Structure formats: C-alpha cells, structure tokens
C-alpha cells in the first residue's frame, strides 16, 4: 500500500496563500494587487483554513491556485517586470548624473494596454453594460475630487470628460427612466440596450479627502474602469451613428461647461462630406476626356451631323404621338370621397419606447441661478425639453438673440418671487423629479414657490412597506383600540373554550338542563345561541392559526440548516419592516392630529 503524502490533496492543493503567490509570480505586492484588480481575481475563503494553510492557524489571505496559474501567462505581468528593470536603469543613470541617458530611457519607456483584458472579462457587449454601474460610480466620484499630490488634475479632467460623454449620450438618446435625490447625491437609472443601469452622481460640494484612504488601489480600479467605459462609449456612439469622441464647443465651454457644450455629429453626414470631393474629381476627369474625343469626332464627321439630327427629331415626334394615344386610352374614372366622417387614423409609432423620453418635448424651461443647472439640464434634455440657464445668460453678450417668449416653465428655489412673467408656470425642482418617476406630468399646484413639497420617495423603494402618500384615516386609532379590546376578549373566550373542550360530554348532558333554567328565568334561547356562535367563530379562528403553525413547524423540520437560517432571517427582516411601518404610521397620525388642532385654533381666531 502506497503512503499518501501530506498537503497534496483537497484544500492544500486548491488554495495558495498571498505570500506564496507573490513569490511564484516574482512581482511586488503592489503589482500583484494591480494585476488581481485588472483580471478580476479576488481572495477566497476555504472551508478548512488549517488544512489549506498546511496545518498552520496563522491568519492569511488565500487565492485559488488555478487563478494564480492563470496569471502567470498574462502579458501585463511581463510589462510589470520590464518596468522594474526600467526603474532600476533610470535610478542608476540619475545617480551617475547621466541626464541625457535618463531622458532617452524616459522617452523609450514601455506602456501597457488593458484592451485584451476587457475582451477577456466581457466577451459580449451586454456583459459589459451589466457591470458598468461600479465604473460610473467610481468615475463620477473622481470627477468631483479636488486635485492633490495623490490625485493629479489630469486624472480628474479625464474622469470629467468620460462622465460628460456618458451623460451626453444618455441625454441625446433620451434613456433616463428614474431619478432620486438623496443625501449622498443624485441616483439616475437609464435603460441601455435593454439593461437597467443605475449610478450615483455626488453633489458638487468641496470634498474633504480622508487620510486613511488607499488611493493606489482606487486609482488602479479607475484605470480599469476608464478603459472599460471607453470601449462601451465607442460601441454606443457608433451604434447610434454618432462620431466618438464628441467634439467640444470651446466658446460654450468657457461660458458654462455642461452638456450643451458637446457637439454630437452624425457619422453618416460626415461620411457623405468625405466622399463628395473624390466623386466630383472623378466626374470632372471623365468629362474632360469625353470633351477631347468629341472635338476630334466632330471635326472628322461634319458632313454627317445634319442628316443624323433630322432623323433623331422625326423619331422623337413619333414617340410623343404614341405616348399621347396610350394615355388617352388608359384614363380611368376618378372617384371622390364625399364622406365627412373619416375612418380611424392609426397613431404612428414613436421613435422612443418610453413615455418619459418625450415628457417635456413641448416645454422650454428657464432655470434660475440658485438651482443646480447640471442636474436639471441633463434630466430636461433627456426628456425632450429645452433649457435656458440664467447663469449662462449673465455671461452672454448678445442676450437679444435668445427668444424668452417661448419659455413655458421657470424653475425657482426661492420662497417668494417679487416679479412674475405672465404665461409662465413657476415650479420647484422637485416637480421635474416626480414627473420622471411617475412617467407623466404631475399637477404643478403642490410645487409652487414657497409651498410645502410632498415627500420625495425613492422609485426603488419597498412596495410592501410604509407608503407615505397614503391618506390618514380618522377612525384608524379607534379601530386599533377596538381591535385590541376584541383580541383580549377573544383570548379570554379561547381560554374558556380550551377549558371546555376537556369536558364536552358533560356539556351535552347539561345543555337540556340549561335551556330549561333559562326559559324559567325568561331568557330566550336565540340570545344564548348567538353567544355560542361567537364562541364557535373564535374557536375556528384559533384552530386555523394552530393548523398553520403546525404546517410551518413541519416544513421547518424538512428544511436543511442553511434553509432554516435563511427562513429565520427572512422572518426577522419582515418583522422589522412591519415594525418600522407601524412606527411611521403612528408618527403620521400624531402629526395629522397636531395639524388638525392648529387648524381648529386658527379657525377660532
């Protein structure tokens, strides 16, 4: 019998520690982390850590051995090793004072690309769109950061550029479906090629960068995500027939940098412009050759030209006469439709699938300077509306060119307005958000300047939980009190029923005697029968509850430990949600009571 070697099977073979992986790949720990981020390899948790670590109980990080073997054939790994030798040569040249050789090394420095990794990790385009949420969140985060020693201004500008290109595409194709303004920032949801994409855009406030953040790891993720977004944007722009990257209008960018400063050109128009000059040149060359040959032919055949011209004229006359005769023969009667009631006219299908895409197509919005233009401009343009910004108008020289008579809505975030223009609807910014979330135009009465706004709810909230928009019923408290009293009565009756179940036989024997006694006292038998019915109802209710509990217990017995834990977690979370909903309902009732009291006092005054 062969003796089995230790640590050659199972967890010891399938897992490898981080220090072993770094030693095997012959790279530094920082390069190993970067490589794992690029390739999407993460630490794993073995079932038996002691066996995986070959008997040791020291806390370590484990990876799959196959993943590390897969990393050994990565081209980026070779580039990391080349960079290591380059850094060694550069430090040696600088130490010796050889500036020219250091410059030459810097100019010939090798660079790596992540294109092949993107293709490996996302073999199809829908896969890339499904994983684009984290990429957008990271890029929008960096686009709002201030430039520091750790994060250069070039990185921030590149992130801003990619973010604006993404927003410009979404607004152009009108793909926004949901929006929610929270404490963290603004959440957007768009439908990209049938996939729901949700991302967070932070508010443009000055950020205080914490000192404990490891920017090396974050910048590695940013490098990968920016490459991924370049791929995705190129595909989206080309599928829509647009040129990528879009051009930037420098004049508009200087006035106010926004989506309006991007020029989205069609690829078809551009291709036609490129093809026209070549086609014109070819036509000119052909015409010049034909003219030279014709001159020589005319000089040679001057005598025959007159005869040929006469014959051609006669043939043309004959053809015209034949055509007239045919038209006279084939003329048909014309029938006019005298019916005033026309048939049903079919509504032509819209270019856009969702009603949100053309929600503001008939409106022109004038955004006041106190309102954040970047949020509202993106939402209004993606719903088909037009935007005029007061902040941008302050910097424009020729204000007369802008037609302000077309403005239908003015978005204001002030409590009181002194001067109002007739014909405009004055609203607060929340009107835009609620219209998009509901998919229809909401009445503007509740959103007038200075009005108390309705609650701004998350469109991705739990449908089972508390609904703040539900009206408060006046008799809810009385019902709850009566319900609690009835429950107490039912419990008392149940206890009596349980005690009476033991001696049912005695009750049957004494029933006749009770009836006789009641008749002697003058009490009707029908009253006692109604009381018995109530008792029977409560008895049936209790039986149903007991049966349901027994069924649940039996199902729990048949479950595995994993399923039992999951079921308990679900029960706990549902109970918590119900408790929170009840607390919020109670608060709402109290607020409604206080408002009613205040209204009564105001009416008395």
Swiss-Prot record:
Q: Where is the composition biased (Acidic residues)?
A: 303-312, 473-510
Q: What is the effect of changing residue 380 to R?
A: Temperature sensitive mutant
Q: What induces it?
A: Expression is down-regulated prior to the diauxic shift.
Give one Pfam family, short name only.
Pescadillo_N
Q: Which InterPro entries did the record assign?
A: BRCT_dom, BRCT_dom_sf, PES
Q: Name one GO biological process term.
A: maturation of LSU-rRNA from tricistronic rRNA transcript (SSU-rRNA, 5.8S rRNA, LSU-rRNA)
Q: Where in or outside the cell is it found? A: Nucleus, Nucleolus; Nucleus, Nucleoplasm
Q: Which residues form a coiled coil?
A: 294-342, 530-605
Q: Which GO terms describe its molecular function?
A: large ribosomal subunit rRNA binding; mRNA binding; ribonucleoprotein complex binding; RNA binding; rRNA binding
Any idea which residues bear Phosphothreonine here? 308
- BRCT domain mapped to chain residues: 355-449
Further comment? Present with 4530 molecules/cell in log phase SD medium.
Q: How does it assemble?
A: Component of the NOP7 complex, composed of ERB1, NOP7 and YTM1. The complex is held together by ERB1, which interacts with NOP7 via its N-terminal domain and with YTM1 via a high-affinity interaction between the seven-bladed beta-propeller domains of the 2 proteins. The NOP7 complex associates with the 66S pre-ribosome. Also interacts with NOG1. May also associate with the origin recognition complex (ORC complex).
This protein is called: Pescadillo homolog
State the species of origin. Saccharomyces cerevisiae (strain ATCC 204508 / S288c) (Baker's yeast)
């Amino acid at each position: 019998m062969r003796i089995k070697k230790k640590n050659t099977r199972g967890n010891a073979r399938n897992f490898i520690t981080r220090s072993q992986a770094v030693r095997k790949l012959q790279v530094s720990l920082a390069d190993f982390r970067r490589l794992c981020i690029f390739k999407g390899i993460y630490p794993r948790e073995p079932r038996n850590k002691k066996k995986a670590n070959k008997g040791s109980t020291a806390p370590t990080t484990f990876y799959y051995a196959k993943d590390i073997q897969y990393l050994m054939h990565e081209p980026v790994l070779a580039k990391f090793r080349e960079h290591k030798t380059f850094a060694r040569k550069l430090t040696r040249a600088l130490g010796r004072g050889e500036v020219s050789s250091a410059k030459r090394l810097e100019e010939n420095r090798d660079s790596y690309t992540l294109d092949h990794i993107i293709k490996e990790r996302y073999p199809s385009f829908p896969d890339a769109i499904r994983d684009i949420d984290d990429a957008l969140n990271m890029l929008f985060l960096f686009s709002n950061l201030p430039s520091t020693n750790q994060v250069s201004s070039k990185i921030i500008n590149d992130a801003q550029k990619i973010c604006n290109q993404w927003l410009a595409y979404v607004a152009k194709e009108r793909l926004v479906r949901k929006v929610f303004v929270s404490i963290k920032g603004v959440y957007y949801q768009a439908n990209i090629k049938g996939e729901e994409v949700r991302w967070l855009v932070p508010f443009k406030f000055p950020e205080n960068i914490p000192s404990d953040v490891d920017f090396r790891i974050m910048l590695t993720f940013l490098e990968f995500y920016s490459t991924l977004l370049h791929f995705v944007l190129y595909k989206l722009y080309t599928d829509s027939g647009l040129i990528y990257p879009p051009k930037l209008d420098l004049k508009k960018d200087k006035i106010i940098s926004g989506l309006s400063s991007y020029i989205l050109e069609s690829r078809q128009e551009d291709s036609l412009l490129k093809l026209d000059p070549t086609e014109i040149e070819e036509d000119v060359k052909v015409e010049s050759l034909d003219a030279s040959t014709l001159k020589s032919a005319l000089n040679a055949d001057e005598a025959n030209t007159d005869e040929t011209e006469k014959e051609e004229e006669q043939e043309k006359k004959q053809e015209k006469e034949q055509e007239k005769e045919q038209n006279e023969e084939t003329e048909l009667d014309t029938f006019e439709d005298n019916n005033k009631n026309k048939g049903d006219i079919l509504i032509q299908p819209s270019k856009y699938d969702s009603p949100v895409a053309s929600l503001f197509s008939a409106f022109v919005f004038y955004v006041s300077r106190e309102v954040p233009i970047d949020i509202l401009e993106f939402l209004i343009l993606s719903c088909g509306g037009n935007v005029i910004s007061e902040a941008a108008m302050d910097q424009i020289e020729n204000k007369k060119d802008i037609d302000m008579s077309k403005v239908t809505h003015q978005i204001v975030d002030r409590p009181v307005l002194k001067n109002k223009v007739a014909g405009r609807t004055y609203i607060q910014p929340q009107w835009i958000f609620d219209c998009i979330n509901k998919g229809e135009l909401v009445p503007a009465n509740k959103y007038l300047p200075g009005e108390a706004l309705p609650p701004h709810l998350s469109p991705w909230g739990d449908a089972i939980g508390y609904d703040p928009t539900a009206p408060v019923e006046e008799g809810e408290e009385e019902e709850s009190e009566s319900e609690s009293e009835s429950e107490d009565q039912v419990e008392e009756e149940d206890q009596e029923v349980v005690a009476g179940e033991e001696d049912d036989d005695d009750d049957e024997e004494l029933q006749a005697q009770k009836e006789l006694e009641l008749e002697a006292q003058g009490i009707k038998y029908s009253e006692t029968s109604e009381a018995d019915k109530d008792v029977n109802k409560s008895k049936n209710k209790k039986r149903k509850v007991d049966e349901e509990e027994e069924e649940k217990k039996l199902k729990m017995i048949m479950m595995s430990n994993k399923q039992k834990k999951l079921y308990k977690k679900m029960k706990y979370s549902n109970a918590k949600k119900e408790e929170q909903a009840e607390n919020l309902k109670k608060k709402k009732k109290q607020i409604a009571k206080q408002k009613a009291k205040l209204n009564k006092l105001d009416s008395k005054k």
